Structure formats: structure tokens, C-alpha cells
Amino acid sequence: MRKSLLILAMDHDIHADAVHDLVTQQGHTSYRLDPEVEWPPSGLSEEEEEWLPSAQLQWSLTRDEHVSSLTWHDQRIDLTNIGAVFCRNFQFARVGDEAPVERHLKFAEMRAGLYGAMRTLDGCFWMNRPWLEDPVDNKMVQGRDAKRFGLNIPRTLVTNSEDSARRFVESCTEGAIIKQLSEIGLIDNSSGTPETYGFYTSIVTEEALKHLNEVSHAPCLFQEAIPKKADIRATVVGDKIFAHAIASQSKTASVTDFRREIDLASETFDFPEETGNTLLNMLKSWGMEFAACDFALTKDDRLVFFEANVTGNWLWLEGKDNHPILDEIVALLSSKLNT
């Protein structure tokens, strides 16, 4: 009996769309749900029913059997017949602090029920298991592990001490950069005009040094700046690496952080076998089947590891008719559905 694919993703996610479409084109059954959407109460208007899911969980356990199913919109998902999960989003719906206690309880029970149903998908292949992502989705943990496995890494300091930060910056002969330690991005609408909080990787300038006392408010991540020829994105799918060189040095805005430009040229890159094996071994130790990993290619052709995004994007590196990363993701997921 063929098993089905379950995709956990936000409703508007082109990467989830691409995987779903290609899997179904190959004759497999694929279901989608967004864990971050609130389960609605009964008695909704027609308009509300269009965008809130009709959600119903059935999970039972006896001495003889385990039965689990989920109805989501018009999908009735037999969770005991899921062979693989493609997980892009495992954040759950939350309620504001000002909400009544009844809604807090409802949301807590929604999270616990859906989390439990996902954790009890027996014998299921995950790309990736989100409960394994959380412990390693941290720049400090990744830096430590990269060092342990033998990848080249930049000198790094995490501190909220102005004196320590200043000494570190002054010791970096090629300059220093500052990075956001967390991945959070916040939008403040209180003024009527949305303001985004969070920052790109940036050079610590002379002007920034004048305000270095501000690091005392929270830990900040400093690294030595790495002069580079290009940024290298190594997208790992299972035991395969798809590497691209990004022409980040071709534009002033993207020299330090290529995310500042959206139309940079890229080309496939011959990733060194030894470094590739080291990277794969590190990701396997984390239990990851997918990661988008960022390196610098230095001017003397060394690869320096920066970080791994375990839910990173890849379609921006691929063409409409040539998409080897997408093909490999779908091939790996589909191979788990034919048992």
C-alpha cells in the first residue's frame, strides 16, 4: 500500500507549493496543513470558513491498535499511513497576552494535540524533525560543532560587555562584523507606519564603535571579517550537496551580507569532497536531512563556515525548467512512500 506525504508549512510558501505539485504529478498523495492557523469554533460565517480550516483530530490508543486521523479543510488525513513529512513550519498558533483564559487554554490544547499527533507518526521519515532542529538552530551551537568537526570557522565572540567587544574588534586586522544572534524579525505598527526591527550582518564601523556601550543591553555576536571572493551556499539534501557560488562581491551593498541584494548572479560550485564529507557528518550528528549552509570562499580559496539554516530556501538558486535541488527533495521524499 502506498503511503502519503504530509507537508507542514505556512499556507503561502512557494517551496511547499513546489514540492506538493511535483509529488502529486508523480502520482503520490500529498496533504498540507499550516500548524500556525487557529482551529475555528463551530458556527462560522461562509467567509470565515473560507480561510479557517475545518479541523478535527481523532487519536485513539488501545492495547491492540493505534488509530490517528486529522480532518483539515476538505482533507481527511490518515496519520497512520503517512510515510514522509516535509516540514517547513512547526510554529503553532498563539494568542495575545490580553486574551481571556479560555482562549489561552484552547490554544495550549491545540498545540499539545497537534504536537502529540505529529510525534506519534510511527516509522515516518522527516525532513526535518523539528524537535531536533531546535537544539541546533543556534549560531553558538553551530559554531562549536563546526569547530569540533574540523570546519574552518571565523573567530567569534558573543558578549554584552563593552570592554570585551571593543578589545575583540580592535584585534581583528581585517575588521569585524556584528550579527543578530537570534533569527527573530519584529514589526512595530504602533506609529501607524510599519517599522522592521532586526538587522543584517554589518561591519563594525568607527561610528558604531562610538555606540558600543549599547551591547550591554543584550548579548551580541561579533566575528572577524572574512575577505572573500564569493559567498557559497551549500544546500544539503540527504547525502547530496548542491553548491552555488554567489557573486556577493559584485555589488557594494552585498559585500558583507548577500541578503541585501535580491538579483545577484550565481553559478554552480564544485564543493570540495573533504569539506563536504565533514559537513555531511556534522548534519547527520544533528539528525538533519536538509540544510542550507553558508560559507565564505576566501581569496586563498579556503571555505569558512558561517551557519546552517535547517529550513532554508533554495528556489532562488534554481531555474524554472532546471531544478535539481527540488528534484532531489521530491525523490528522497517519494522513496519513502512506496513501501
Per-segment meaning from a language model:
Residues 2-6:
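Extreme N-terminal starter segment of soluble prokaryotic enzymes
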Residues 62-64, 73, 236-240, 248, ...:
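Short acidic-glycine loop/turn motifs at beta-strand connectors
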